[in-house]
Amino acid sequence: MKKPEVHFHSRHESGNTLYILGMVRDVLRKQRRYTDFNNLRDAVLNAGSYEEALQLMNGYVILIDDDGLYDLRKGV
């Protein structure tokens, strides 16, 4: 299964970790991946940094920063 893309703007409201997590939640719910989301949510809430949280979420979807600050294809 191809990972869906989730776009965000790191310099704006949609760059907030919880905002991004909500967008990822919506994608995973549509795919009925409830357990995956629960595990991801717990990991993100325990992440030590913004970058770590992005990397965790990027494991489930393709995160794309439309502001260009974070290139998650190469690592944060």
Show the residue positions of the predicted features.
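Long, contiguous binding/interaction regions
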Residues: 1-76
